Amino acid sequence: MSLQQYEILLDSGTNELEIVKFGVGENAFGINVMKVREIIQPVEVTSVPHSHQHVEGMIKLRGEILPVISLFSFFGVEPEGSKDEKYIVTEFNKRKIVFHVGSVSQIHRVSWEAIEKPTSLNQGMERHLTGIIKLEDLMIFLPDYEKIIYDIESDSGVDTYNMHTEGFDERRTDKKLIIVEDSPLLMRLLQDELKEAGYNNIASFENGKEAYEYIMNLAENETDLSKQIDMIITDIEMPKMDGHRLTKLLKENPKSSDVPVMIFSSLITDDLRHRGEVVGADEQISKPEISDLIKKVDTYVIE
């Protein structure tokens, strides 16, 4: 099943997404269609000495060597050994990774507004979830795939996010930034790196809806928000309101249209960049390049 030719009919800024639903044990999970390159039958895996316990090994696919991560192992579930098991070939954070899952069933279209933030769940699963979708009698978990990769690589001594601060610059200290990011891990990394570089005046929000309401409150007493906000940095995938919808609303409003908006997301690829352009994003940078983000922010606010 190839999703490279699958036509994503959603327009940018509609605050909707399409997810591929799959099973791991008794639970149903989902992944954004935009992250999925194709879904294949499991193939022979070459084990790698001293690899992480959740990494099954490597496979060769169309001339590329790709790592295989078992979501059975990651979520503490025994593999089913079923002929229905699948490999989901994904692309995000400028890399390709294969996830070993159970059966893959169908694609669902849902609104980000309907996706709830995870609360405390059994076995601490909420640490690796970005949201929960309730569909009639079914609950679908949305894993935080970036955090899964980060945790595995951190255990192996790998610096996923290439943390190399550009150094402190006094000119950055009076600039007001807004960060919109639902991942606590990414929010912390972004804040730490930006503050170390001199960007101390930061307002942060975990979804686009909260950020938009905050910005519109500022707009009540201001005709040009660019005097109060120097730049907005937003993720795309977030419950309640995604980054594309947030960007579209801000650019359509005369009071906020001049505020630079940078999309910082694992979904920034050559194939998907146009979706940010359509809604008016001033800049788009792919995770995990935080150092590149700081350089680009500088070009908008201090240079």
UniProtKB/Swiss-Prot annotation:
Q: Which residues does UniProt call coiled coil?
A: none
The cross-references to PROSITE patterns, in alphabetical order and at most eight, read:
CHEW, RESPONSE_REGULATORY
Q: Which residues does the UniProt record annotate as the domain CheW-like?
A: 16-154
In this protein, which residues make up the domain named Response regulatory? 176-302
Keywords assigned: Chemotaxis, Phosphoprotein
Asked whether the UniProt record includes Calcium among its keywords, one would answer: no
Residues where 4-aspartylphosphate is found: 235
GO BP: any one term: phosphorelay signal transduction system
Q: Which InterPro entries match?
A: Chemotax_regulator_CheV, CheW-like_dom_sf, CheW-lke_dom, CheY-like_superfamily, Sig_transdc_resp-reg_receiver
Observed effect of gene inactivation: Cells lacking CheV are somewhat reduced in chemotactic proficiency, but a double mutant lacking both CheV and CheW has a strong tumble bias, does not respond to addition of attractant, shows essentially no accumulation in capillary assays, and has greatly reduced methyl turnover on the methyl-accepting chemotaxis proteins (MCPs).
Q: How is it modified after translation?
A: Phosphorylated by CheA.
The record's annotation in SUPFAM superfamilies points to: CheW-like, CheY-like
User: Is Ion transport one of the keywords?
Assistant: no
Note one Pfam family from the annotation.
CheW
State its role.
Answer: Involved in the transmission of sensory signals from the chemoreceptors to the flagellar motors. Chemotaxis involves both a phosphorylation-dependent excitation and a methylation-dependent adaptation. CheV and CheW are involved in the coupling of the methyl-accepting chemoreceptors to the central two-component kinase CheA; they are both necessary for efficient chemotaxis. Moreover, CheA-dependent phosphorylation of CheV is required for adaptation to attractants during B.subtilis chemotaxis.
Q: What is known of its domains?
A: Consists of two domains: an N-terminal CheW-like coupling domain and a C-terminal two-component receiver domain.
Family annotation (PANTHER family): CHEMOTAXIS PROTEIN CHEV
Protein's name in the database: Chemotaxis protein CheV
What organism is listed for this UniProt entry?
Answer: Bacillus subtilis (strain 168)
- Gene (UniProt): cheV
